[in-house]
């Protein structure tokens, strides 16, 4: 039947069908609704605009937007209800694509001179909220004023939500202030507007105003849930407890959403015991309750407990949501539970969450932290729509696994895709620049941080300071450090480390004393940096003082890194016997690293007998590093013990240890040039060889002499001697 024949009359039978379809719309019962649709077609009532509008509404509410749009397009003389049915369907569906469709429908509606009503405007404002924009919404706001629709609580609440989600909280507050009446949704929208922007004080003020104005017996759980979501730091736990008491006083703990919000609040405020008590006392737990507690454990460093709780949830037959899976995946990332993470990946596929952005981001993060970058990349590539969190997870994964070049390539792709970076993104990219010691690129990234409005707060400030320091630009590093507000221990460590590694040990130690004077408590990394500074300066006594200071004054137990710094300190000072005694008295499991440091020092100082002792220790412990065998064989060669040299090489071959090829690189005009031993593939290898020969001749002319090191490097072609220049 041609669409132009749409009728308007209703008969008793079709009126009954209309009521049935409306009921199925409310229940989202797609199967039953389709059956009624079939009956409507058989009676010929589908030509009635009232039925067509209800059909559009039914399919839209059931998520079948393409079908709803098809029926809508068949209506020639559309009324405001027709437009509202489709606009509301798309706006409630959410998402960027649906929200843009709402904007297009609104333009078409205005072009056909259809005057919108309150429901139309509410749909527009909701869609603009999803886009976090207010461009079309402001035009619709002007229509609200023009049509005298201001005062409709449904429209005004949607308008407040649009402005708040677009970040224009002050504009939302203006609308809120002039509303003649407000319901609990209005109050919760305003509180959430401040809460999502981290403006806790303003959120609390609105909440207090609500408590004074709320009517007795009115539903207020949404408002309490909204204000609790704003309390996400330890300093707010006391305020959270007060709100908890008010919920008990008002008898609101029966609302599951509110109980979940309390569990989340206590978890974010690092009060895990209270979160557990709240979880245990929740009588009617749903998947959100379990997710909140799993995430709470994960965020508070109790990753193993998070995994155990998920097992309990699974055993209890509770179907997890994607957010539950995300919480457990994050826990597996933190404790390197790769096998469990893979099982969760399979479970995620079974539940159909593989295309969910949050779940995929957690998967990418888990695989990246476990070093499985190929799997992480597969997860990244399978999604068409990627947000900043997903890009950042993969970029930071490459940086953590020392694939800094790929991290920078991915960052360029991210910029090309128009994704605006966040703090963790920039911190990871700056770390990549630090590792590559590429100053010019680091300066460009610094420019990006300024362009995107990032300040020098943590972590950007400390990452910038580290980058400049590692690239040898200490003046710029110090300038960033001094301008960083609210410095944390990471900021101090970055600058101390930069000074130490650039030969300014005295300045590093002075900065450490300044750190103590300002009341900042040092951590493990701080002591690694200052003992390292003492090592490079030869301050043995001072190094001992700081090593003992860790446990005696700060209460930190020295770790392997601190013992390694002390062995290096003693070795550099020529106190090799003391270094050996220190290693043997160490009460921690240090593996091979301490003996490796001592072996290298013995070789440099010509202490052959002690070097043999350290080298044999390493061989007995099953060292897999070729340098151990190379250095030990060199010492035996110097002693003329050729049988031992042969024994060392046999042991090396038997253990499958091979000599790693030497590699170096330079940055020239924003391009990396990588060279390996025996390289003949570089396009400028001949020019490079000529330049090396020229520099070698100039070094000899300046008084440098070639010294043959007796360390043997065994290769398939034969035995090769390594050479180095000394003055």
Swiss-Prot record:
Chain segments carrying region Type E(+) motif: 670-700
GO process annotations (BP): lateral root morphogenesis; response to temperature stimulus; RNA modification
A molecular-function term among this protein's GO annotations: RNA binding
Region span, Type E motif: 594-669
Protein name according to UniProt: Pentatricopeptide repeat-containing protein At2g33680
Organism: Arabidopsis thaliana
Pfam family membership, one: PPR
Keyword vocabulary terms for this entry: Repeat
Highest taxon, organism lineage: Eukaryota
Positions annotated as PPR repeat: 13-47, 48-78, 79-116, 117-150, 152-182, 183-213, 220-254, 255-285, 286-320, 321-355, 356-386, 387-421, 422-456, 457-487, 488-522, 523-553, 559-593
Lineage of producing organism: Eukaryota, Viridiplantae, Streptophyta, Embryophyta, Tracheophyta
Family membership: Belongs to the PPR family. PCMP-E subfamily.
């Amino acid at each position: 039947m041609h669409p132009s024949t749409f009728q308007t009359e209703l008969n008793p039978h079709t009126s009954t069908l209309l009521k049935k379809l409306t009921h199925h719309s409310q229940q989202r019962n797609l199967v039953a609704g389709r059956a009624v649709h079939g009956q409507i077609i058989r009676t010929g009532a589908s030509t009635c605009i009232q039925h067509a509008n209800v059909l559009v509404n039914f399919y839209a509410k059931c998520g079948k937007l393409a079908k709803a749009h098809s029926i809508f397009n068949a209506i020639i003389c559309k009324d405001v209800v027709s437009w509202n049915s489709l606009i509301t369907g798309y706006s409630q569906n959410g998402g960027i694509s649906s929200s843009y469709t709402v904007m297009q429908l609104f333009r078409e509606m205005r072009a056909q001179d259809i005057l919108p009503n309150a429901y139309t405007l509410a749909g527009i404002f909701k869609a603009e909220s999803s886009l976090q924009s207010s461009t079309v919404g402001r035009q619709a706001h002007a229509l609200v004023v023009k049509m005298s629709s201001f005062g409709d609580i449904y429209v005004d609440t949607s308008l407040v939500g649009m402005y708040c989600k677009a970040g224009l909280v002050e504009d939302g507050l203006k609308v809120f202030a002039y509303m003649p009446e407000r319901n609990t949704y209005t109050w919760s929208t305003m509180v959430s507007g401040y809460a999502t922007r981290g403006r806790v004080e303003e959120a609390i003020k609105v909440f207090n105003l609500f408590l004074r104005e709320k009517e007795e017996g009115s539903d207020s759980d949404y408002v309490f849930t909204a204000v609790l979501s704003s309390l996400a730091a330890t300093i707010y736990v006391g305020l959270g407890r007060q709100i908890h008491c008010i919920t008990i006083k008002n008898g609101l703990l029966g609302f599951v959403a509110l109980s979940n919000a309390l569990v989340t609040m206590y978890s974010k405020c690092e009060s895990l015991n209270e979160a557990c008590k709240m979880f245990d006392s929740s009588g009617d737990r749903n998947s959100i309750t379990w997710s909140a507690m799993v995430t709470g454990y994960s965020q508070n460093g109790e990753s193993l407990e998070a995994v155990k709780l998920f097992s309990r949830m699974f055993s209890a037959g509770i179907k997890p949501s994607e957010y539950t899976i995300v919480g457990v995946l994050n826990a597996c990332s933190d404790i390197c539970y790769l096998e469990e993470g893979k099982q969760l990946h399979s479970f995620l596929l079974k539940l159909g969450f593989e295309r969910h952005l949050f779940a995929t981001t957690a998967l990418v993060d888990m695989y990246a932290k476990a070093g499985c970058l190929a799997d992480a990349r597969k997860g990244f590539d399978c999604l068409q729509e990627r947000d900043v969190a997903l890009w950042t997870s993969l970029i930071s994964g490459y940086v953590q696994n020392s694939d800094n070049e790929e991290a920078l390539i991915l960052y360029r792709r991210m910029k090309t895709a128009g994704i605006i970076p966040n703090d963790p993104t920039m911190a990871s990219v700056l770390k990549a620049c630090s590792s590559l010691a590429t100053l010019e690129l680091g300066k460009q990234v610094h420019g990006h941080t300024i362009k995107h409005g990032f300040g020098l707060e943590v972590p950007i400030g400390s990452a910038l300071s580290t980058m400049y320091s590692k690239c040898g630009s200490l003046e710029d590093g110090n300038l960033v450090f001094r301008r960083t507000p609210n410095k944390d221990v990471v900021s101090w460590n970055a600058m101390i480390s930069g000074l130490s590694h650039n030969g300014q040990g005295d300045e590093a130690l002075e900065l450490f004393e300044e750190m103590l004077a300002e009341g900042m408590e040092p951590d493990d990394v701080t002591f690694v940096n200052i003992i390292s500074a003492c090592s490079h300066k030869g301050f043995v006594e001072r190094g001992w003082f700081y090593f003992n200071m860790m446990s005696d004054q700060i209460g930190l137990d020295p770790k392997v890194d601190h013992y390694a710094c002390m062995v290096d300190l003693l070795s550099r000072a020529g106190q090799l016997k003391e270094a050996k005694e220190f290693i043997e008295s160490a009460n921690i499991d240090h593996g091979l690293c301490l003996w490796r440091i001592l072996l290298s020092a013995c070789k440099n100082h010509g202490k052959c007998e002690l070097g043999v002792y350290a080298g044999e220790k390493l061989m007995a412990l099953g060292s897999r590093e070729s340098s151990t065998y190379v250095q030990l064989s060199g010492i035996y060669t110097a002693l003329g013990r050729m049988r031992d040299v042969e024994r060392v090489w046999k042991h090396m071959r038997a253990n499958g240890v091979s000599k790693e090829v030497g590699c170096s690189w330079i940055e020239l005009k924003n391009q990396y040039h990588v060279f390996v031993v025996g390289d003949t593939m570089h396009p400028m290898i001949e020019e490079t060889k000529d330049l090396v020969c020229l520099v070698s001749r100039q070094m000899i002319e300046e008084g440098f002499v070639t010294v043959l090191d007796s360390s043997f490097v065994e290769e398939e072609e034969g035995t090769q001697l390594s050479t180095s220049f000394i003055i």
